[in-house]
Amino acid sequence: FSPFENIIGHYEAHDEQIPDTYSQYANIAMETLMLKCQPAMEKTTGLKLYPAYTYARIYKKGDELKRHKDRFSCEISTTMNLGGDDWPIYLEPSGKEGKKGIKVDLKPGDMLVYSGCELEHWRNKFKGKECVQVFLHYNNCKTPGAKENMFDKRPHLGLPSWFKR
């Protein structure tokens, strides 16, 4: 990796969700994708949305995404399969913790839209070699605090997380 890897992405040893994976917060290409997808997202959800941030990750064999709900910036979320081996995501739409959930398989190019703050979601232990995902996150313009949270509290898109206000 280049000496610039901490600018464009990095291996995160202490990541709370998936330690020791390569990840990128706010990659400029992914943030551009988020803006390009916004009209379709608004049509799909029936909501006017503010863009929050993007996050991309390369998962490896043995990784596991524990059951969780997301933070406020992930109110309206997507996960898009960019390539690699199959790795289903599970959602629990009833809102009841601990239930089995619904399995969703995503092929490369497929994108799932979900309410990240409301739905428990997870992935079981990964058995493949690698799986590349990007997450595009938005807020509903009508949600209190959404305007102040635009761009995940950065002055504009494309900036690293340390620019948050």
Regions found by a protein language model. Name each.
Residues 1-45:
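Non-heme Fe(II)/2-oxoglutarate
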Residues 31-35, 50, 69-72:
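Alpha-helix initiation and capping sites
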Residues 46-55:
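A short coil-to-beta-strand element that immediately follows conserved catalytic motifs
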Residues 58:
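Conserved active-site beta-strand element of glycosyltransferases/polysaccharide synthases
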Residues 61-122, 130-134, 139-154:
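Catalytic core of non-heme Fe(II) oxygenases with the double-stranded beta-helix
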Residues 149-165:
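Glycine- and charge-enriched low-complexity intrinsically disordered segments
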